[in-house]
């Protein structure tokens, strides 16, 4: 087996990125030498992510639907619910517009059927995910060589959380793809003596787009930008001729887009940062202790890759990327409101270190070498025999991550999506007149899945200016029967369908009978509780006289 031969622009380093190693050309183990050309790698990743997208049938977080698809649906079809964030101007239209183009294509081709409307957005996201996979391979190859790149790609595809989350339509997912792409082009991350300014400009463009889509991405690019500023010999040129013009162009473009869509001038990044960082507005949706990312959140995402990532960080001695992970986790730890997806952009970086550890094990087992990037050439072995340690490690990761990925993607919290898919099909057949969701706000997808302009009502949870004031969701959970009875007093005509969790349904059965509702479908939702009491199933009720 070849161990990649490289030229070191900064002396005889130990193979980490801080050693500034570069390619000497397309040798057998150079980029793509292990598993094919960039095109073949991309097509392989795309096929994998398409299957990945089709396997995701669960609900994770409301923003997947309410902050992207719902907005895009309203833009193209003229109806859809805009949450309070859009009324306060803390969201940019840049990300939803990607899906608006998809919806427009489906509209003009007449393909906007219930099934395609449900599946198409995640299939579109699978293209972005595959691009991210390709650039993870390219970045790993630029840093450490083709062997590490192959293992890094394996780790990316085997990680349960990447499988579960990356193909969802969160802005965080596109931010993650742009982060990996951008890091590939920045000279301070990898030595790039050829076409140096062009690479950096591309890196700046991608970084600016990431910040436009997700303003908190500035946490990542502030670190990278300061590192580049420290290392570049021409600091004035970097700031005056590159950062300011490129940043201004991207900011200007997004401001014009938001001006067109909002109808007035809105500086979204400023509003977003003010709400989330200065006023801690996100705390309304719950808080975690400062150490949560370090002791729970990021470790759950890495799962059984954790020891391998730690080993890779130690062995590679790549202080730049390991410090980036630490920086992001530390900054996000300052905020009270924490979520797994907020730190998703640095998960692939941690998986690169896992790939390094696996490549180290492979090389150590096959040639007794102590370094993945050792300059020595070893004759190619067509069939490299894995050491027992390497084989056991691979089996261990697959045995732990595959069941987790499939369970979370196919079973855990699937009831709300199943219920909406059912209602979408019923509405398509003209069997739904109106829907009331008696469950915590944003528990289901909305018009982007139903795709029929019929009256729907859910329980509002807009943050209140009065501290301690209960929103509709909280009021309902405190007293389900009293809240539902108050709603019913104002009905001129009852909704044709009511959707609720089984935990509340048991308290409202008499109410349902009294108002002539009967159960029509029940969907499994979860085996264990997450934030609230166990929501084991989602129940759909229909009023008896809704249809003759």
From Swiss-Prot:
The cysteines covalently paired via disulfide bonds are: none
Which cellular compartments is it found in? Endoplasmic reticulum membrane
State its Enzyme Commission number(s).
2.4.1.-
Q: Which biological process terms from the Gene Ontology are attached to this UniProt entry?
A: attachment of GPI anchor to protein; embryo development ending in seed dormancy; pollen tube guidance
Give the EC class as a word: transferase
- Recall the GO molecular function terms of this protein's record: mannosyltransferase activity
Q: Name one GO cellular component term.
A: endoplasmic reticulum membrane
Q: How does it sit in the membrane?
A: Multi-pass membrane protein
Report the InterPro entries cross-referenced here.
GPI_mannosylTrfase
Q: Which residues are glycosylated?
A: 167, 382, 490
The protein's role, per its UniProt record:
Mannosyltransferase involved in glycosylphosphatidylinositol-anchor biosynthesis. Required for the pollen tube micropylar guidance and embryo development by regulating GPI-anchor mediated protein localization (e.g. COBL10 and A36).
Q: Per its UniProt record, what PANTHER family does this chain match?
A: GLYCOSYLTRANSFERASE (PTHR22760), GPI MANNOSYLTRANSFERASE 3 (PTHR22760:SF4)
Its family remark reads: Belongs to the glycosyltransferase 22 family.
- What this protein is called in its record is Mannosyltransferase APTG1
Record organism? Arabidopsis thaliana (Mouse-ear cress)
Gene behind this chain? APTG1
């Amino acid at each position: 087996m070849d161990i990649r031969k490289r030229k070191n622009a900064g002396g005889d380093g130990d193979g980490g990125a801080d050693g500034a190693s570069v390619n000497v050309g397309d040798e057998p183990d150079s980029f793509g030498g292990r598993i094919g050309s960039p095109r073949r790698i991309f097509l392989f990743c795309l096929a994998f992510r398409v299957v990945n997208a089709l396997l995701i049938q669960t609900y994770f977080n409301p923003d997947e639907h309410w902050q992207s698809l719902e907005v895009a649906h309203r833009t193209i079809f003229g109806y859809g619910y805009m949450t309070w964030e859009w009324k306060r101007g803390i969201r940019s239209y840049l990300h939803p517009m990607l899906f608006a183009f998809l919806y427009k294509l489906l509209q003009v081709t007449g393909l906007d059927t219930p099934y395609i409307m449900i599946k198409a957005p995640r299939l579109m996201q699978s293209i972005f995910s595959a691009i991210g996979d390709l650039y993870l391979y390219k970045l790993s190859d630029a840093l450490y060589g083709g062997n590490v790149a192959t293992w890094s790609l394996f780790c990316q595809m085997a990680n349960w959380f990447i499988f579960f989350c990356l193909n969802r339509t969160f802005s965080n997912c596109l931010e993650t793809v742009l982060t990996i792409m951008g890091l590939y082009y920045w000279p301070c991350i990898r030595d790039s003596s050829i076409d140096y300014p062009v690479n950096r400009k591309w890196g700046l463009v991608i970084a600016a787009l990431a910040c436009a889509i997700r303003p908190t991405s500035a946490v990542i690019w502030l670190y990278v930008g300061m590192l580049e500023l420290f290392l570049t010999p021409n600091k004035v040129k970097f700031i005056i001729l590159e950062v300011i013009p490129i940043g201004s162009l991207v900011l200007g473009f997004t401001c014009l887009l938001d001006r067109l869509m909002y109808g007035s001038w809105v500086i979204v990044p400023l509003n977003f940062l003010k709400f989330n960082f200065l006023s801690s507005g996100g705390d309304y949706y719950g808080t975690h202790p400062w150490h949560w990312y370090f002791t729970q959140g990021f470790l759950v995402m890495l799962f059984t890759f954790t020891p391998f990532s730690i080993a890779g960080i130690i062995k590679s001695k790549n202080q730049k990327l390991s410090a980036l992970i630490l920086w992001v986790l530390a900054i996000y730890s300052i905020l009270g409101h924490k979520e797994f997806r907020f730190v998703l952009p640095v998960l692939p970086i941690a998986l690169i270190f896992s790939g390094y550890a696996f490549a180290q094990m492979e090389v150590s087992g096959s040639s007794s070498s102590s370094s993945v990037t050792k300059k020595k050439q070893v004759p190619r072995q067509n069939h490299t025999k894995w050491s027992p340690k390497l084989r056991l490690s691979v089996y261990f990761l697959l045995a732990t991550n595959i069941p987790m990925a499939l369970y979370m993607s196919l079973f855990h919290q699937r009831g709300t999506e199943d219920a909406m898919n059912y209602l979408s099909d019923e509405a398509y057949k003209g069997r739904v007149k109106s829907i009331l969701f008696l469950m915590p706000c944003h528990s289901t997808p909305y018009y982007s899945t139903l795709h029929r302009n019929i009256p729907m009502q859910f329980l509002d949870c807009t943050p209140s200016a009065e501290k301690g004031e209960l929103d509709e969701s909280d009021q309902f959970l405190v007293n389900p029967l009293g809240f539902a009875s108050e709603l019913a007093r104002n009905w001129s005509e009852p909704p044709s369908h009511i959707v609720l969790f089984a935990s509340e349904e048991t308290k409202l059965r008499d109410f349902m009978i009294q108002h002539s509702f009967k159960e029509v479908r029940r969907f499994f939702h979860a085996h264990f509780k997450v934030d609230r009491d166990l929501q084991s199933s989602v129940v759909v009720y229909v009023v008896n006289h809704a249809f003759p």
